[in-house]
């Protein structure tokens, strides 16, 4: 019996017919007997060499694996035929001139292998690359290829199963592997080296891609800076120079945007463009970004004033029509991309974190031994520090945006848009009625300092909720209750109201209790810090006794040590309640609590700003003096009515609220402000309206009261109605001057004074 080696290749080509024909024509035209023996050696090496997946996609087909696993060994001494026969397989392609010889020898061995055929499994040929499916009805017999001593599969093999290398490349690869084995190297080591080479090339490509992304985003960023600097800023400054609004406000909004634009457009962007052109010789960006470090101070100034800028844009858009008109006109242009001014102003804040992200990705791909490693790492450290400040500003902007959304959902009636307010949690919940314990649908907005308890509105447009109760976090307690009929209940007890609430599930209940308790704890921690600061300050100031106030310079409390006025405890904000220092005790107080002046001995007897308490101790005061120094709403009605341009009772209505009678006064000392009191002798005004910028509508609607008129500015609408047409015209004469900024002189005889009306006690209640 002959010994048959396991089959590892087929005489049938795995290439498509076109490639087979091409290879056959090559062999027919250029093969010789001398080359044929060489071909035999190469093919024998190829067939015996292990075929592992590699760069060129060499794979072993399922049929080849099956044959190699199940072919039996043929015992015998007849090896002359297998050793002396010519090879009929060359790299998996049948040579045309030897095909007939191979077929004859296969036929000769077919009859002697019947027993072997019976033991072989059936092989099916499936559709490959769209070819038809042919299933062998007879056992597929592995026959001995007399050309090289290997068994070949006689079943039908579909072309195109895997890529086949050209003969020259296949032979070269085989010789390399043989040489490796002779040198003691394994094919796996070569494969790892190849993969390492490919990885190196891949990293280089990724580094170039990151650098190119930096360049592309920098171009887009410079375009945004041009939009802010050359369009928004310039157009608004032109309008301000016409006298529509102060130019100083425009400068505060845009801060140092011109300097930032100049740096990026004239330095950083040209440097990046030049470097990308020279990337083949200088593949690095760390040295360029390191030059960015000294200019990050510009971003610090921009980010620091960002909150104030956003507040200014909001207020000026609402109150100044000319400002709003210019901004909206620019926002309609294609260059804005349907985005608002506030959105574009956020671009510089977001840019620094973008640099940080790209640099981190760049360093991950950069080899540690690269020349750019140290520069890139140093740049990342500097930029990461600046990015932390930018991220803080982004979070504040996102929080402010959310507050505006809630403000609109509540019908713009709750004053919640304040940088000090932070939304913690919101969601739907059920409220258990006290009388019949029925469950009613409610909605909660939890902030860091209050809980808004709201009732849903079932309307397609407008506000979605009505605020039923505002419960302060100060003094709030959370109690977990047990109710068999109503599960998942808990109680929120505050100074303003106690609510028994029902969550939708045990998890929802747990989340609400956790959020509420953490908010309460954080609130108390802030106030504890505040109280400790005061106590510590009192210890430090123990040397400055009451008798020494004004005689000895105090230690000033730092601005960042407090978040609220140390006298009235109202929270500070950048726009309406700024920080001031009392020159006598050093406390940080608001404008209202520091609206006093006293002579301080340690400062040479100069009049200096002091708080209310220090003013009382240093100067002493009378009741009348105290009244003169009260806030704008605390000015007594009798004071302004006796020295006013016009004053009388008017019917007043705001938004959808009902009409109510109010004592209205425009004083001579403040002729551009309308004061409204409940009665002529009230010591505090209910509201004030700065008249500058309002639009006056003299024509009442049919639904309004007779002799009515309206004051409109942005979303604020105030409706008034006089008792007569004559009184209405007297008011309009004064108001029409005030809304344009002109100061009415005011006649000696007031158009409508207290003498024109009986005492309030004789009239109906307001």
From Swiss-Prot:
Keyword Cytoplasm attached: yes
GO molecular function terms listed in the Swiss-Prot or TrEMBL record: actin binding; guanyl-nucleotide exchange factor activity; small GTPase binding; zinc ion binding
Disulfide bonds: none
Residues forming coiled coils: none
Predominant location: cytoplasm
Family annotation (InterPro entries): DBL_dom_sf, DH_dom, FDG4_N_PH, FGD1-4_PH2, FYVE_RhoGEF_PH, PH-like_dom_sf, PH_domain, Znf_FYVE
Keyword Metal-binding included in the entry's annotation: yes
One GO term describing the cellular component: cytosol
Compositional bias annotation for Basic and acidic residues: 167-184, 752-766
UniProt tissue specificity: Expressed in different tissues, including brain, cerebellum, peripheral nerve, skeletal muscle, heart, uterus, placenta and testis.
Binding sites annotated in the UniProt record for Zn(2+) 2: 582, 585, 611, 614
Localization (cell): Cytoplasm, Cytoskeleton; Cell projection, Filopodium
Region: Disordered, residue numbers: 1-20, 46-83, 134-188, 742-766
Residues binding Zn(2+) 1: 565, 568, 590, 593
Keyword list, A-Z: Actin-binding, Cell projection, Charcot-Marie-Tooth disease, Cytoplasm, Cytoskeleton, Disease variant, Guanine-nucleotide releasing factor, Metal-binding, Neurodegeneration, Neuropathy, Phosphoprotein, Repeat, Zinc, Zinc-finger
PTM-bearing positions, type Phosphoserine: 702, 716
Signal peptide range: none
Disease (UniProt): Charcot-Marie-Tooth disease, demyelinating, type 4H: A recessive demyelinating form of Charcot-Marie-Tooth disease, a disorder of the peripheral nervous system, characterized by progressive weakness and atrophy, initially of the peroneal muscles and later of the distal muscles of the arms. Charcot-Marie-Tooth disease is classified in two main groups on the basis of electrophysiologic properties and histopathology: primary peripheral demyelinating neuropathies (designated CMT1 when they are dominantly inherited) and primary peripheral axonal neuropathies (CMT2).
Assembly behavior: Homooligomer.
PANTHER family: FACIOGENITAL DYSPLASIA PROTEIN, FYVE, RHOGEF AND PH DOMAIN-CONTAINING PROTEIN 4
Record note on domains: The part of the protein spanning the actin filament-binding domain together with the DH domain and the first PH domain is necessary and sufficient for microspike formation. Activation of MAPK8 requires the presence of all domains with the exception of the actin filament-binding domain.
Protein name: FYVE, RhoGEF and PH domain-containing protein 4
Taxonomic source organism: Homo sapiens
Taxonomic classification: Eukaryota, Metazoa, Chordata, Craniata, Vertebrata
Gene: FGD4
């Amino acid at each position: 019996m002959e010994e048959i080696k396991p089959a590892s290749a087929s005489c049938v080509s795995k290439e498509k017919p076109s490639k087979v024909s091409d290879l056959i024509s090559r062999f027919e035209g250029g093969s010789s007997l001398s080359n044929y023996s060489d071909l035999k050696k190469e093919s024998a090496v190829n067939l015996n060499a292990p075929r592992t997946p590699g760069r060129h996609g060499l794979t072993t087909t399922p049929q080849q694996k099956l044959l190699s696993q199940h072919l039996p060994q043929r015992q015998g001494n007849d090896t002359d035929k297998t050793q002396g026969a010519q090879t009929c397989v060359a790299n998996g392609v049948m040579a045309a001139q030897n095909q007939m010889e191979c077929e004859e020898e296969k036929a000769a061995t077919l009859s002697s292998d019947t027993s072997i055929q019976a033991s072989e499994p059936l092989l099916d040929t499936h559709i490959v690359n769209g070819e038809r499916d042919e299933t062998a009805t007879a056992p597929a017999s592995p026959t001995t290829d007399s050309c090289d001593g290997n068994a070949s599969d006689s079943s039908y093999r579909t072309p195109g199963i895997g890529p086949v290398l050209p003969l020259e490349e296949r032979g070269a690869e085989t010789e390399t592997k043989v040489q490796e084995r002779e040198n003691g190297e394994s094919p796996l080591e070569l494969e790892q080296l190849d993969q390492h080479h490919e990885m190196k090339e891949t990293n280089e490509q990724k580094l170039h891609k990151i650098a190119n992304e930096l360049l592309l985003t920098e171009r887009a960023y410079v375009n945004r800076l041009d939009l802010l600097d050359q369009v928004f800023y310039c157009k608004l400054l032109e309008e301000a120079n016409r006298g529509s609004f102060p130019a100083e406000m425009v400068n505060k909004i845009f801060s140092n945007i011109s300097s930032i634009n100049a740096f990026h457009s004239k330095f950083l962007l040209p440097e990046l463009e030049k470097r990308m052109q020279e990337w083949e010789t200088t593949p690095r960006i760390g040295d360029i970004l390191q030059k960015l470090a000294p200019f990050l101070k510009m971003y610090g100034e921009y980010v620091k004033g960002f909150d104030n800028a956003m507040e200014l844009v909001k207020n000026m858009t609402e109150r100044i029509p000319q400002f709003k008109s210019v901004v909206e006109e620019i926002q309609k242009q294609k260059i804005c991309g349907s985005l608002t001014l506030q959105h574009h102003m956020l671009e510089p804040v977001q840019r620094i974190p973008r640099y940080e992200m790209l640099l981190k990705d760049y360093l991950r791909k950069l080899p540690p031994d690269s020349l750019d490693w140290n520069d890139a790492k140093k740049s990342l450290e500097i930029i990461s520090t600046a990015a932390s400040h930018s991220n803080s500003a982004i979070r504040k902007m996102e929080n402010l945006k959310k507050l505006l959304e809630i403000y609109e959902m509540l019908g713009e009636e709750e004053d919640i848009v304040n940088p000090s307010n932070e939304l913690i949690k919101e969601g739907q919940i059920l409220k258990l009625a006290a009388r019949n314990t029925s469950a009613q649908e409610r909605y909660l907005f939890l902030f860091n300092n209050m809980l808004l308890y709201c009732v849903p509105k079932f309307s397609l447009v407008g506000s979605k909720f009505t605020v039923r109760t505002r419960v302060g976090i100060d003094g709030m307690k959370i109690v977990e209750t047990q109710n068999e009929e109503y599960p998942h209940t808990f109680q929120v007890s505050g100074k303003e109201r106690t609510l028994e609430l029902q969550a939708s599930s045990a998890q929802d209940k747990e989340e609400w209790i956790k959020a509420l308790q953490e908010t309460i704890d954080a609130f108390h921690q802030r106030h504890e810090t505040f109280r400790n600061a005061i106590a510590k300050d009192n210890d430090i100031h123990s040397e400055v006794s009451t008798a020494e106030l004004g005689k000895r310079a105090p230690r000033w409390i730092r601005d960042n040590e407090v978040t609220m006025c140390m006298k009235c405890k109202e929270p500070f904000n950048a726009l309406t309640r700024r920080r001031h220092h009392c020159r006598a005790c050093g406390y940080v107080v608001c404008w209202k609590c520091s609206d006093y002046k006293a002579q301080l001995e340690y400062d040479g007897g100069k009049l200096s700003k002091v708080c209310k308490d220090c003013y009382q101790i240093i100067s002493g005061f009378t009741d009348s003096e105290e009244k003169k120094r009260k806030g704008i709403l605390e000015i007594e009605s009798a004071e302004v009515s006796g020295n006013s341009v016009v004053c009388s009772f008017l019917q007043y209505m705001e938004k959808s609220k009902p009409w109510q009678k109010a004592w209205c006064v425009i004083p001579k000392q403040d002729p551009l402000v309308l004061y409204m009191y409940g009665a002529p002798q009230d010591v505090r005004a209910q509201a004030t309206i700065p008249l500058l910028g309002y639009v006056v509508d003299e024509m009442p609607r049919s639904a309004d009261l007779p002799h009515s008129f309206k004051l409109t500015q942005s979303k604020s609408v105030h409706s008034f109605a006089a008792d007569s047409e004559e009184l209405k015209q007297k008011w309009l004469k004064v108001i029409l001057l005030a809304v344009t900024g002109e100061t009415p002189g005011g006649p000696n005889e007031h158009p409508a004074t207290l003498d024109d009306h009986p005492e309030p006690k004789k009239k109906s209640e307001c």
